[in-house]
Amino acid sequence: MLDPNHLFDITVIGGGPVGMFAAYYAGMRKADVQIIESLPELGGQVATLYPEKEIFDVAGFKGITGAQLTANLAEQLAVFEPTTQLETSVKAILPQEDGTYILETSKGTTHTRGVIVAVGNGAFTPRKLAVDYQPEWENNYIHYFAKEMAQFKDQTVAVAGGGDSAIDWALMLEKVAKQVYIIHRRDQFRGLESSVDALMNSSIQIKTPFLIDGLTEVDHQLALSLNKMKSTDQEQLVVDKLLVNYGFISDTRILRDWGLTLDHHQVSVNQQMATNLPNVYAIGDIATYPGKVKLIASGFGEAPVAVTELLTKLYPEKRQPLHSTSIM
């Protein structure tokens, strides 16, 4: 429950991996910190959408699933027991005369000296197929998320998309499905070179450059009508499941309502991760600056920068930061 009379040092808005690590590091620095997360659990998009998908850009791990990463971060975070508000959305960030902020949320107000925005891609919805289909086919034949690999076991599966996520899903599905196809409208894939190499050397059947332009149900399976780009050639592919990876449409309008300066729907920050608002910082995928690389690994590096800079502003008289080996 929110306590409107308690003054936190730092409020982290967003409980994804980067927000969780920011709260942990703030705890290391003896800050009074809380996390506000709109979802029912911590972990953000990684935990909600991709619990069984392996992540390859976290230092120290050859590969780690979203669920494993979230569990590790939760165990780490528990060391300092930060206040955590789940299923709570921030509606407004209101500056006060004394330099603090009142946050209006869906569950009341909370008071904080500083804010770290770590909301990932904001509210997101999957970019859907641009063809008509029966609504009941969704989550039966057609999937936009793949939370459990077991549902694809021994199935014929098509993956639509040509980026990192589509390639990664296809490679994971190859381990459990009877047959995997990947359908992309371009000849070239847009994934990491190592992932594309793995795809080319796999048993996955590649359908390029094709676009799905029709769907029909045939004997409890899904028939895909494939149109070859810049051609009248057509193919039909019959599958048990279709996993669509066309990316997500993000809604970051609330950030502008908070008074933050945006650049192409992301929060503009300087090299200290500071926004245009005093004592408000942004990290992770929502933050942008020249040379930004949108990886979890980048966000993990941005978190200590934001925490350190914020605490320096709040408590300039305190000794600034020690190595973890000196304080743990």
UniProtKB/Swiss-Prot annotation:
InterPro entries attached to this UniProt entry: FAD/NAD-bd_sf (IPR036188), FAD/NAD-binding_dom (IPR023753), Fd--NADP_Rdtase_type_2 (IPR022890), Ferredoxin-NADP_redctase_2 (IPR050097)
Task: Give me the comment on cofactor binding.
Answer: Binds 1 FAD per subunit.
Q: Which UniProt keywords apply?
A: FAD, Flavoprotein, NADP, Oxidoreductase
Any idea of its EC number?
1.18.1.2
Supply the enzyme class, top level.
oxidoreductase
Q: What is the disulfide pattern of this chain?
A: none
Q: Which domain of life is it from?
A: Bacteria
Annotated FAD binding lies at 37, 45, 50, 90, 124, 285, 325
User: Would I find 4Fe-4S among this entry's keywords?
Assistant: no
Required co-factor(s) are: FAD
Q: Which residues cross the membrane?
A: none
Q: Which Pfam families match?
A: Pyr_redox_2
Transmembrane helix recorded as keyword: no
**Which molecular-function annotation in GO is an example for this chain?**
flavin adenine dinucleotide binding
Please list the reactions this protein catalyses. Answer: 2 reduced [2Fe-2S]-[ferredoxin] + NADP(+) + H(+) = 2 oxidized [2Fe-2S]-[ferredoxin] + NADPH
Subunit: Homodimer.
The record's comment on protein family reads: Belongs to the ferredoxin--NADP reductase type 2 family.
**What PANTHER family does its record include?**
THIOREDOXIN REDUCTASE 1-RELATED-RELATED
This protein is called what?
Ferredoxin--NADP reductase 2
Which species is this UniProt entry from?
Answer: Latilactobacillus sakei subsp. sakei (strain 23K)
